[in-house]
Amino acid sequence: MDSSEKELIANLKSDGNREKAFKILVKTYQVRLYWHIRKIVMNHDDADDILQNVYIKVWKNVDSFREDSSLFTWLFRIATNESLSYLQQQRRHSVVSMNEISEYLVESLESDVYFEGDEIQKKLQLAIIQLPEKQRIVFNMKYFDEMKYEEMSEILKTSVGALKASFHFAVKKVEEFLKEEPK
């Protein structure tokens, strides 16, 4: 943790500088957090809502942040947990199978006016959607966010070995999907 991050945390925890520090936090991490969430839930509006929930949790709980990890890691852990909670809540409220959830994610991707990828990018996203939830998150964090396994381990509370295995299997499944998909 560098000195500017320590200063930001101190300001977030002090009443006098809290709002200004919070604006800096939002400006610094908003884009990365949004895209991390978006890759999990696949929908712009849902990602925006979840991001707001993340900020509310951070605002309410910053005083309990123990600084065992970096601020970035703590924020990503909250964003990941909020995203997974959202998906679990969606599953509970609607009695649907995993296939139906995958179909919903595919439909969301195909009808998303904010998706700007070409056909190759779309095929990759379709392949990623087919992955089990945990593998999808690990793949996105490693491939797109270029996170180190140690960082991912802190965020996901999973061993480095398990993350490497998840990523390996995810890559194999994505490769298979891309080979099978018509060009």
Regions found by a protein language model. Name each.
Residues 64-66, 77-97:
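Arg/Lys-rich amphipathic alpha helix in sigma70-family domain 2
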Residues 26-44, 61, 128, 173, ...:
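Amphipathic, Lys/Arg- and hydrophobic-enriched alpha-helical face
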Residues 35, 49-56, 69-81:
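Structural recognition of an alpha-helix C-terminal capping motif at a helix-to-coil junction
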Residues 14, 42, 55-70, 90:
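Sigma70-family region 2
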Residues 138-142:
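A short pre-motif secondary-structure segment
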Residues 2-7, 93-117:
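Internal acidic/polar
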